[in-house]
C-alpha cells in the first residue's frame, strides 16, 4: 500500500472521494447535468434520459493523472418504450487499497411534450484495505420542463434522505446535493447550459458549458465551474450508431483528468 495515497485521501476527501461520473459530454459542459438531456443523465438528473430514442449503451474510462493508480470506470444503458424509459448504471472509482462502487437503476416518464420526471435507486459499496467494506443505499429524484424550443429547465436532488454507509468500521456519508439548471438552444447547432449545485457542507458551485455542433458528425465543447474552479474541454463524434465522446478536466490542485466514452445505439 502506498501510504502517501491513503493519507492524501484521508486529508482531502472533498477532492478525492468519488463524484458521479457524468460522461465526457456532460463533463465537458462543466459537469453540467441538471437540465441537459443525455444518456449519462443517469448519473445526474434521471429525468434527462428522455431523448434517448433507441436502446443505447455507453462505456466510460477516466484517468486521474495526479496518481498512476487511480481511475474511474463507468457503464450506462437506457431502454425507451413509448413515453417510459428505464436505465441502469455502474461506476467504480479508486485503486487497489481503496475503492467506491455504485450500481443504479432508473425509471423516467414523460407527461405530454413538456414535462418529465425521473427516479434513480443506487446501491453503494466502499472498500478500504485493513478496514473492511461497507454498503449503503440512496435515491436521486429529478424533473425536466421544456418551456419552448429554446429553453429547458431542470432540477434534481441526490440522496435527499441523507443516507450513510452502514458499517461500524467505516464511517462515511453518501453525499447529498441539490441542483437546478437551465439549457438554452439559440440554434439547432448551439447549446448553452448552466447549473447551480449545493452539496451539503460544501460551497455552492456554479457551472457553465457550451456545446457547438460544427457538422452532424462533430461537436466541440467547453465549460467552467466555480467551486472548486475547474476548466473543461471536449468533443464528440456521432457516426451512424456509434457515439465517441472525449473530455478533460483541469483542476489547479489535481491537474488533468482525461476521459473517453464509447456508445452504441441499437
Regions found by a protein language model. Give the residues of each.
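Sec-dependent N-terminal signal peptides
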Residues: 3-13
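Subset of outer-membrane beta-barrel
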Residues: 17-266
Amino acid at each position: 500500500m502506498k501510504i502517501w495515497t491513503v493519507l492524501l485521501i484521508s486529508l482531502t476527501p472533498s477532492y478525492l472521494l468519488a463524484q458521479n461520473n457524468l460522461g465526457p459530454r456532460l463533463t465537458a459542459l462543466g459537469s453540467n447535468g441538471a437540465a441537459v438531456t443525455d444518456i449519462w443523465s443517469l448519473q445526474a438528473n434521471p429525468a434527462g434520459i428522455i431523448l434517448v430514442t433507441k436502446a443505447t449503451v455507453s462505456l466510460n474510462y477516466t484517468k486521474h493523472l495526479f496518481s498512476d493508480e487511480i481511475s474511474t470506470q463507468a457503464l450506462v444503458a437506457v431502454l425507451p418504450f413509448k413515453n417510459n424509459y428505464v436505465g441502469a448504471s455502474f461506476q467504480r472509482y479508486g485503486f487497489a487499497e481503496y475503492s467506491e462502487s455504485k450500481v443504479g437503476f432508473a425509471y423516467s416518464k414523460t407527461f405530454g411534450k413538456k414535462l418529465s420526471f425521473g427516479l434513480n435507486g443506487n446501491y453503494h459499496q466502499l472498500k478500504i484495505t485493513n478496514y473492511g467494506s461497507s454498503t449503503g443505499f440512496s435515491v436521486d429524484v429529478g424533473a425536466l420542463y421544456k418551456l419552448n424550443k429554446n429553453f429547458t429547465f431542470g432540477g434534481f436532488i441526490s440522496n435527499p434522505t441523507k443516507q450513510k454507509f452502514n458499517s461500524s468500521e467505516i464511517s462515511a456519508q453518501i453525499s447529498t446535493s441539490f441542483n437546478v439548471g437551465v439549457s438554452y438552444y439559440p440554434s439547432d447547432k448551439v447549446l448553452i447550459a448552466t447549473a447551480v449545485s449545493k452539496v451539503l457542507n460544501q460551497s455552492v458551485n456554479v457551472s457553465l458549458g457550451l456545446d457547438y455542433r460544427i457538422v452532424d458528425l462533430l461537436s466541440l465543447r467547453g465549460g467552467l465551474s466555480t467551486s472548486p474552479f475547474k476548466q473543461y474541454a471536449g468533443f464528440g463524434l456521432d457516426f451512424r450508431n456509434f457515439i465517441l465522446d472525449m473530455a478533460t478536466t483541469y483542476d489547479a490542485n489535481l491537474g488533468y483528468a482525461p476521459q473517453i466514452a464509447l456508445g452504441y445505439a441499437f
